[in-house]
Structure formats: C-alpha cells, structure tokens
Regions:
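Bacterial N-terminal signal peptides that target proteins for export
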Residues: 1-16
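Ligand-binding pocket segment of bilobal, Venus flytrap-like solute-binding proteins
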Residues: 73, 145, 156-160, 164-243
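Hinge/capping helix and adjacent helix->loop/strand transition within the periplasmic-binding protein
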Residues: 83-92, 105-189, 247-249, 259-292
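An extracytoplasmic/periplasmic, membrane-proximal ligand-sensing/linker region
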Residues: 31-33, 214, 270-331
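C-terminal lobe and pocket-closing loops
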Residues: 125, 209-285, 314-317
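N-terminal (or domain-start) structured segment
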Residues: 27-116, 152, 176-205, 212, ...
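N-terminal signal peptide c-region/cleavage motif recognized by signal peptidases
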Residues: 20-24
C-alpha cells in the first residue's frame, strides 16, 4: 500500500471515529421537563413512590430535566390512562401504574388496555395487609371473621371495583363474613378513616398505613401473600413486617399482590424506553429507594422487556377472572 493510500485510509478511520463519538454524544435524553402521572390521589402508595423517584432523580442529578408529578385519579385512574393513550410518541411523559391498569377498563368499559401504552419497567409488587384499629376488639383474623358473620363490617378501600374491593369480595366468599365496602379517593385517606374509626377494617398497602402503625393507631392481622414479608427490622416495639403472618396461615385463603410499574405512551422509540429503564435502574440502586422498599415492605420483583409484557398478559387475564367471579365486569 502506497503512502497516499495509507494517509487516505487513516483519514477515513479518523472520520468514522468522529462519527461514532458524535452518535454516542447524541444519545436520546429528555429536552424538557418530564411529566409523571399518578392515576390516584395524593398520599397513597403510587403517589409516594412517584414522589420518591422524583426526589431521588433530583438529589442525585440522574437527569438534566426535572420530573413533575401530577395526580390524575379521576375515574379510578381512567383520566390518566386515557390522556396518556392520546399522547402517542410523547417521550416526556411517564405513568406509574397500579393494578387499576387492569381493573378500571374491565369494570367500566372505558376504551383502554395496557397494550395502548409502552411498558417500561416493573419496579416492585405491593403487598396488601388486613388492618384494624387498635381500639377494636379484634386481635386475629378469626375474631374479625367471626364478627363479620354476625354484623356487616365497614371495609374502607380506594375505589369501587378496584383492587381493595376485589380482595374484600374474596374475603367474603372465602369466609362467609359480610362487609359494606366504602370507597375513598386514595390509600392515605383510607388509613386516616380507619384511625378515625369511620371504617372497621381495611386492606391497605403497608406504605399507606406504616406511619399509623408506628403511632400505635392500627393493628395488622395478616398479609395477602404466599410468604411473610422479608423485613425483620422492628416497626413497633414488638413487631416487624416479617412478624405479620400470611392470611392463608390464619385460615383466610386469599392472596393478592399489586403492580407498581412505569409506562410511556405508545409510539416511542426503543432508545427512549432504554433511557428510562437505565434511569430507573439507577434510582433502584440508591439508598433512598432501598429505604422506601423496606419501609413499605415491598416485594422487590422487577421486570422489563418481554418478561414484563408476558407478566402483564397473565395478570390481565387473572383480573378478568377475579372480576367475573365478583360480578365486577362491565356489561
């Protein structure tokens, strides 16, 4: 190879190298504030998780643009779902989801499915715990069920035909206990209503009731999971999350876990999805996130890509069956 050819080849290599650097430098990232929708009211588990993510991203400088959390809980989340559905291709919009992702369209017939969105990542699964006021006479599942067979107990929850309501119906079917379901705007409000004695019992998520448990205002009876929660640190002087027995071990054969996942509108690119997957992985590695997981006793299952989509397919069908059994499907 002559000198001139070698020089030309060297120049080509240099140009290609520069192009690669330019492509790397131009990897997609948000160019304006990212709107972060919560399809539920303030103070509940989804709201707390979204605001924790927002704070972690800001504190650790994980993204150049800020996150702006907005609560859009109208219609049991339908307000948020339909708005995100309409914003195809908007990569500056995130949605944190509950299992209302399935229950709301199935119960109301609203024209929406999770397939109208782009799944980004499952962050965790949220537990449900059966709670009573500490001033109540019920110290076990058996005592609560016995009371529910002689009188209708008021069960507080976060929405008609939603997750809490499904569990309430399942408890009644499994035990013969009777409940009057009283819906509120969010899990935070439900916990306050239990503390105030306005309802007899709830099936709140741990993070929604933990402050009241620490204060000695509410008592956990069981967790609706197949195994105890793996968090041994004491929350009260005598109990940790791990000390709460499973409902099945107490004779109540009902299990239910709730999705905590992140979605984007349809029509976004794989590169844009990858940006947020990587961002959320960085969030999950922080001490603040680990503290949230322990405080809220979350099941830390995390999925993305094809695994997440397969899980969503299965859960949608499971919810269809559960809601059919409860008589909750839209007609």
């Amino acid at each position: 190879m002559g000198l001139s050819c070698r020089r030309m080849l060297a120049r080509c290599v240099a140009v290609l190298g520069a192009c690669c650097v330019a492509v790397t430098a131009q990897a997609w990232e948000p160019s304006k504030p990212v709107q972060f929708y919560v399809p539920a009211g303030t103070g509940g588990g989804a709201d707390q998780m979204a605001r924790t993510i927002q704070a972690i991203v800001a504190k650790h400088g994980l993204m150049k643009q800020p996150m702006v959390v907005q609560n859009k809980g109208g219609g049991a989340g339908a307000e948020a779902f339909l708005e995100v559905k309409e914003k195809k291709g908007d990569a500056h919009l995130l949605l944190i989801t509950l299992s209302s992702l399935f229950t709301t369209p199935l119960a109301t017939g609203v024209p929406f499915r999770w397939t109208d969105l782009t799944p980004v990542k499952m962050l965790a699964l949220d537990e449900f715990v059966l709670w009573v006021n500490t001033e109540s006479p019920w110290k076990s599942v058996a005592e609560l069920v016995a009371a529910g067979k002689t009188q209708k107990l008021r069960m507080g929850g976060t929405g008609s035909r939603q997750e809490d309501h499904i569990i309430t119906v399942a408890i009644g079917r499994a035990t013969g206990a009777q409940f009057t379901y009283v819906p509120y705007k969010g899990g935070g409000e439900v916990a306050v209503q239990l503390v105030g004695g306005h309802v007899d019992t709830t099936v709140n998520n741990p993070i929604e009731a933990v402050s009241h448990w620490k204060a000695g205002k509410v008592r956990p009876l069981c967790v609706f999971d197949s195994k105890p929660m793996p968090y041994p640190e004491k929350i009260t002087e005598t109990m940790s999350w791990a000390d709460i027995p499973t409902c099945k071990s107490q004779g109540l054969d009902v299990e239910y876990l709730m999705l905590r996942g992140i979605f984007m509108p349809a029509g976004v690119s794989a590169e844009q999805v990858r940006f947020y997957v990587d961002l959320l992985d960085k969030v999950r590695a922080t001490p603040e996130w680990k503290e949230l997981m322990a405080q809220g006793a979350f099941n830390q299952t995390a999925l993305e890509g094809a695994e997440f989509r397969a899980w969503l397919e299965r859960e949608e069908e499971r919810h269809r069956q559960l809601m059919a059994e409860a008589g909750f499907l839209a007609k």
